[in-house]
Design a protein with these regions (language model features):
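C-terminal and inter-domain tail/linker signature
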Residues: 5, 19-173
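Bacterial N-terminal signal peptides
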Residues: 6-15
């Protein structure tokens, strides 16, 4: 009787374990730090540098939240992010992002970058100045299931604006 009881307990535990394994295999795969960094890099490299805005839908999750700085709404979804990137590409058609540093830890990737471009289209209330500006920024991405699900952005918008609106100075004057 004792053996039968132990066998039933074993079979029950085995069935439960098998069920849990099946559930975990249908959950999203774990994203490695290397994969997360590549996904974060695509945010600027594919969408901005390669002028491929459709790539955004491949790298952000359906419920992505972007905590933005620099004059945009504080929280944006995928449509808001696409509109923001479109605004920047219209304002700076030659916009180029260079990557200064990536740091990955767990499901977070920090990107430090430098951007530069010639201001040829409206940007918020600022009309085109045809001046070139260079500014820096930092993004913190949270990546889950191979997609960006949350972003915190800080950008030197004030430094960019100063470069675009202040009178040009000539050295020695």
């Amino acid at each position: 009787m004792r053996c039968l009881l132990l066998a039933l307990i074993f079979i029950s535990l085995w069935a439960l374990f098998s069920e849990l394994r099946a559930e975990s295999s249908t959950a999203c795969p774990v994203t490695t730090q290397v994969e997360s960094t590549a996904i974060a890099r695509a945010w600027h490299d594919d969408v901005i540098n390669r002028r491929n805005p459709t790539k955004l839908s491949d790298i952000v999750g359906p419920e992505v939240v972007h905590h933005a700085a620099g004059g945009y709404p504080k929280i944006m979804n995928a449509e808001g992010i696409a509109a923001m990137m479109g605004d920047f590409l219209a304002a700076f058609p030659d916009l180029l992002i260079t990557f200064d540093q990536f740091i990955a830890k767990d499901d977070f990737v920090v990107e430090r970058y430098t951007a530069s471009g010639t201001h040829q289209g409206p940007l918020g209330d600022l009309q085109p100045t045809n001046r070139t500006a260079t500014w820096t920024g930092i993004n913190i991405f949270r990546v889950a299931c191979g997609r960006i699900v949350e972003v915190w952005s800080e950008v030197d918008a004030e430094g960019r604006r100063r470069q675009l609106i202040l009178p040009l100075t000539t050295p020695g004057r």
